[in-house]
Amino acid sequence: MSFDRQLTEDQEVVLKQIWTHLFHLWQVPVDGTHIFPNNSLHSSSTPAKKKKSSWFSKLQSSDHTQDSSEAAEAAHLYEKGKIHKALANLDPQTTKKQFWHDIKNETPDATILKFIRARKWNADKTIAMLGHDLYWRKDTINKIINGGERAVYENNETGVIKNLELQKATIQGYDNDMRPVILVRPRLHHSSDQTEQELEKFSLLVIEQSKLFFKENYPASTTILFDLNGFSMSNMDYAPVKFLITCFEAHYPESLGHLLIHKAPWIFNPIWNIIKNWLDPVVASKIVFTKNIDELHKFIQPQYIPRYLGGENDNDLDHYTPPDGSLDVHLKDTETRAMIEKEREELVEQFLTVTAQWIEHQPLNDPAYIQLQEKRVQLSTALCENYSKLDPYIRSRSVYDYNGSLKV
């Protein structure tokens, strides 16, 4: 959970524009006319520059999912109530429900601002990116995180089970900025152990679990430590690398703190020369190569570094015990769940009402406007607290709940 109180006036306008587009999709009454200068959707606090298409954007097929499509480039006039082209193919009520479930323990503004920053404060490009993400997620991501490891075992998803039991990627504490750390051990990877889809599901489960570790007033992002000890060419698999790049560029923007590549062997050099050409400059800027424990200490404290790497973390990475369901007692309490969900729905409606007033209010920075801002912060906090209450009633407990490292 985090709040951004450092927005400039122009940046705040872009945030309001994105909320206005979402409101029109969700059929929430709001008049955003005065926040679209010259009645154009092309507002940006920085000059828009043409850039090369990322690997992700080259794969897009439908109009509403293309970041470089007409939805992101065409200058059409704003009309009160008119749904932006990038959102036109989305179901209003399904998308609304999904959005408020997906934010979990992050504030609504923090979630949207990640997309805005990724598109350099260009409202059109942001809404195109956000529209694609909403389409991509649908109900899939919530099913993965809420079902957790238990659902994987119950459905006998052998490839995902293999990755879990190898502990190929695990969450191991925090970095020096209190970002959760995902430890990845590529030496354990062999493409024949799972299908591409199973590896993608495992990756999404770990990424979504890491988001539950976010701490209030600290960066809502994750650090990934790739330990290349023992890595050989038999472990190399480009498909999952491309998938991870896609995820962080397109669906988890501004969510990567650092990507630490530790003890890369010489055979990794030609591989790196290929991979680096796929990277968005923002993602590339987060990559750091480390060679020893002292260099790791610049990013992660010893208590969170596994002992085999020279740290003090004694977590057992050789033996995996799957959750047995004994902590899932609240999942059957549908009455309490319904009560907490009703409270959440009421908080969402209050937030939408106050946000519509905040969008429409003029002049800025008068006492009434400041009160609206403060009310939005209060409701955002209440939504985060509500999710903490709701979580045990909708999400099967993970191995991190069992070992006590995760406290939502």
From Swiss-Prot:
It is found in: Cytoplasm; Microsome; Endosome. One of its GO terms (molecular function) is phosphatidylinositol transfer activity. The modification Phosphoserine is found at residue 2. The modification N-acetylserine is found at residue 2. Transmembrane segments: none annotated. CDD domains: SEC14. Non-classical phosphatidylinositol (PtdIns) transfer protein (PITP), which exhibits PtdIns-binding/transfer activity in the absence of detectable PtdCho-binding/transfer activity. Activates SPO14/PLD1 (phospholipase D1) by stimulating phosphoinositide synthesis via the STT4 PtdIns 4-kinase. Modulates ArfGAP function through effects on SPO14 activity. Inhibits phosphatidylcholine degradation by PLB1 (phospholipase B1). May also regulate post-Golgi membrane-trafficking events and have a role resistance to oxidative stress. Forms a complex with 2 TSA2 subunits. Binds phosphatidylinositol (PtdIns). This is Phosphatidylinositol transfer protein CSR1. It comes from Saccharomyces cerevisiae (strain ATCC 204508 / S288c) (Baker's yeast). The lineage of its organism: Eukaryota, Fungi, Dikarya, Ascomycota, Saccharomycotina. The gene is CSR1.
